[in-house]
Amino acid sequence: VCLTDRTTGMPKSSLGPVIDNVLSGSHREVMAVRGIVPPGTLRRVLVAIPQKAEYEVGFYKWLEHVCRIGEQLDCHLDFYAHKETLPYICGYMQNKHSSLRSQYTEMNSWKEWTRLQEQTGKDTMIIVVTARPGFISYKPEFDNLPYIIYKKFAHTSVMLLYPDQWGDPQESVYVFTPNGSAVTRRPRTLKSWFKQILTS
């Protein structure tokens, strides 16, 4: 999914009609990607995670998919999350993916995520874990993500990741004690890369 208008290069006011329809019509996990370089050239992935992300039912599913990205690309994973969220990420990594190179940094205010701009380059991808309106980890600032990406991350590969969020947003039962658990290297295209991540 393209995050900018291909004619003007300016950010779209939304993520486009196709993905907007997908997000409004389904609570399944969605990944919107803007790739600057081939996936096989990436060496580092920064993951920005909002507070209370661990309460979403799709928490461990997207975390597993991020780990698969790290394994396929043999790259370093840097997680930035609230101090109450980090222990769930660390625990999962230690139990399921202890061989992956990873780092964990507290990010207790969502406004801090744009500072990751200082750590990005063409061999870096940033994954922004977001949420649909009405769910527990949603923040109003998420509505401006396409514009922020256009202004601050113009030369960086970016993924917006919407986790599984089941049921009506006003009536969902959230998992307050996260549970459950929810590849060849360097595929040639983004399409084949994501197919391997999601089906392996």
Residue ranges: model-predicted function:
Residues V1-G91, K96-W110, G121-M125, A131-S200:
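Intrinsically disordered or low-complexity boundary/linker segments at protein termini
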Residues Q117-Q119:
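Short glycine-biased active-site loop of nucleotidyltransferases that positions the nucleotide triphosphate
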Residues K111-R115:
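Repeated scaffold domains used in trafficking and secretory/extracellular systems
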